[in-house]
């Protein structure tokens, strides 16, 4: 049976790149994002190009009812099968700690951590059931089920003016660790992919400081996600850091 994935933040940037990469691998998908029109355009493209089933589930990850509805739509469409929950939706706003508005912290917390936590919680029964299925009919591999979260290198190494964003991404890394501790023996594991600056609309403000050819591409991140979901259930990868050339992960 075809593997399925629910991808949030799928209308552009990293989420869209992940959708394209998995569709090219024959996955059936549910694409979620706040704005319906770009989702429809991408879904039509993937159906035509790869012949896969693609559902769209518009919803605001800052709204609890929308998050619930996104999960429900995927599980209904694919009879409760969920091989990969890809948490790509995210938002970031820069500002020093001293003057950062708490309302902006609350919004980043809602989108970057609360929604992923809720989706993991609501999808866990389906992830467990999918992980219990037999080996892949073609490859013979028992993949289990995966949660893959797009985190950030700032969740590992602090950067000035990104305290709120970094804190939510560090929490996302911790959430993946907790999923592994609680669920990996049953075949459900989680991986946080933590890239540095990725060349997307969200980082366009960096183009005057960092050459675009030196930035990580959305396709780089998508390739790492595809690699993780191709592993057997015996391989648990808690996190993957992606840095640009010449950078250091850990500071002395």
Task: Tell what function each PLM region has.
Residues 185, 192, 200, 208-250:
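C-terminal helical subdomain
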């Amino acid at each position: 049976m075809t593997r399925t994935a629910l991808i949030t933040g799928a209308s552009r940037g990293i989420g869209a790149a992940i959708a394209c990469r998995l569709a090219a691998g024959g996955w059936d998908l549910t694409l979620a994002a706040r704005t319906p029109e770009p989702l429809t355009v991408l879904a039509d493209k993937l159906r035509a190009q790869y012949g896969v089933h693609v559902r769209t589930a518009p919803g605001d990850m800052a709204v609890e009812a929308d998050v619930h509805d996104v999960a429900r739509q995927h599980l209904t469409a694919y009879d409760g099968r969920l091989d990969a929950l890809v948490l790509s939706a995210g938002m970031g706003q820069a500002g020093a700690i001293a003057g950062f508005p708490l309302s902006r912290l609350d919004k980043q917390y809602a989108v970057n951590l609360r929604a992923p936590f809720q989706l993991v919680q609501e999808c866990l029964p389906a992830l467990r059931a999918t992980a219990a299925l037999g080996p892949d009919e073609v490859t013979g591999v028992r993949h289990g089920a995966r949660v893959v979260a797009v985190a950030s290198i700032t969740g590992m190494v602090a950067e000035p003016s990104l305290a709120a964003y970094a804190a939510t991404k560090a929490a996302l890394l911790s959430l993946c660790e907790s999923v592994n501790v609680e669920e990996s023996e049953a075949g459900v594991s989680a991986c946080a992919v933590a890239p540095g600056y990725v060349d997307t609309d969200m980082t366009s403000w960096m183009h005057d400081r960092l050459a675009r050819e030196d930035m990580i591409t959305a396709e780089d991140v998508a390739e790492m996600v595809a690699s993780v979901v191709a592993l057997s259930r015996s391989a648990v990868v808690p996190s993957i850091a992606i840095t640009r050339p010449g950078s250091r992960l850990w500071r002395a």
